[in-house]
């Protein structure tokens, strides 16, 4: 069966992976991404690119995957019973950057496409994706820049798109067991098929193409900020919360593991170092306390910037 939609999306995603790696490697200097191609026995494969022990990025990865099969994993079909009995293709690029300097935020993003088919029925398809920022020592102007790029990305598709997907991002990237957000949000969307295919695909491309514009200026502004053991310890502590979200709440991690995806690539998003301290709380009024007090609850960043 021909997959004209799938072929177009896959071509874009492979190109996006190349451009993301080139743009991020340009900030790093001597350390390069190494590529690891893999195949999935049940159908499909991918191309993982990882950077480690860099001067800027302590660890980072940009992963392309295309998996397919004759039946969906339980994590997908349980919530969507109409998908039962359908073959599927899932294709996407996901990326995460864990900088060495605690003043440079961690960043994550992905764009993906899913299609499920069966004989005699219309295909079921949708897009998903977004990007989100996780600072440890946040700077208001950085957060505003991040959200302004997100808003400008969404604007051609309707005035309601940024507020809706910004709110969805705040809700999705929440550690419910901690009652805090993972970071300062950005954009998140899933099950996007409310427009015709070409418009949905154009939106996905806009989101993927906007990431470097949103992130690289922040990296450049904060990379030279001095830090010491205290800041690195706090970074490791907050990275522990990042791990908690990925293993407890993230649907993409669950889908990847249940669908027989490649474990090394799925867990590529994990930070290189993390730590947990029993009942630790930052000193009131400290820069560390400011993160939770001011930044880990949803805010209307752009409205505040214009006030």
From Swiss-Prot:
Xref: NCBIfam families: PRK05330.1 (NF003727)
Biological processes, Gene Ontology terms: protoporphyrinogen IX biosynthetic process
Protein name according to UniProt: Oxygen-dependent coproporphyrinogen-III oxidase
Keywords: Cytoplasm, Heme biosynthesis, Metal-binding, Oxidoreductase, Porphyrin biosynthesis
Organism: Chromohalobacter salexigens (strain ATCC BAA-138 / DSM 3043 / CIP 106854 / NCIMB 13768 / 1H11)
Purpose: Involved in the heme biosynthesis. Catalyzes the aerobic oxidative decarboxylation of propionate groups of rings A and B of coproporphyrinogen-III to yield the vinyl groups in protoporphyrinogen-IX.
Known partners and oligomeric status: Homodimer.
Pathway: Porphyrin-containing compound metabolism; protoporphyrin-IX biosynthesis; protoporphyrinogen-IX from coproporphyrinogen-III (O2 route): step 1/1
Transmembrane segments: none
Family classification: Belongs to the aerobic coproporphyrinogen-III oxidase family.
EC number: 1.3.3.3
UniProt: a divalent metal cation binding residues: 98, 108, 147, 177
SUPFAM superfamilies per record: Coproporphyrinogen III oxidase
């Amino acid at each position: 069966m021909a997959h004209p939609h799938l072929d177009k999306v896959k071509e874009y995603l492979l190109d996006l992976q190349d451009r993301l790696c080139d743009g991020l490697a340009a900030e790093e200097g001597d350390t390069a991404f190494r590529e690891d191609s893999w195949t999935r026995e049940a159908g499909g494969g991918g191309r993982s690119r990882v950077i480690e022990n860099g001067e800027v990025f302590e660890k980072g990865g940009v992963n392309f995957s295309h998996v397919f099969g004759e039946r969906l994993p339980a994590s997908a079909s349980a919530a969507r019973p109409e998908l039962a009995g359908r073959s599927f293709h899932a294709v996407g690029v996901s990326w995460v950057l864990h900088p060495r300097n605690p003043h440079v935020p961690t960043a994550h993003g992905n764009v993906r496409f899913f299609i499920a088919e069966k004989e005699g029925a219309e295909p079921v398809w949708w897009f998903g994706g977004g990007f989100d920022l996780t600072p440890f020592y946040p700077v208001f102007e950085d957060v505003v820049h991040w959200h302004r790029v997100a808003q400008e990305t969404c604007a051609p598709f309707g005035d309601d798109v940024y507020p809706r997907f910004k709110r969805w991002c705040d809700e999705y990237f929440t550690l419910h067991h901690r009652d805090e957000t993972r970071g300062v949000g950005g954009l998140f969307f899933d099950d996007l098929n409310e427009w015709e295919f070409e418009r949905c695909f154009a939106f996905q491309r806009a989101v993927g193409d906007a990431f470097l514009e949103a992130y690289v200026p922040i990296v450049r502004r904060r990379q030279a900020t001095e830090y010491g053991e205290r800041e690195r310890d706090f970074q490791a502590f907050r990275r522990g919360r990042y791990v908690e979200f990925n293993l407890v709440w993230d649907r993409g991690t669950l889908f990847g593991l249940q669908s027989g995806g490649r474990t090394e690539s799925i867990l590529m998003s994990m930070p290189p170092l993390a730590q947990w301290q029993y009942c630790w709380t930052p000193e009131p009024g400290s820069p560390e306390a400011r993160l939770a007090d001011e930044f880990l609850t949803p805010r209307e960043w752009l409205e505040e910037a214009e006030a």
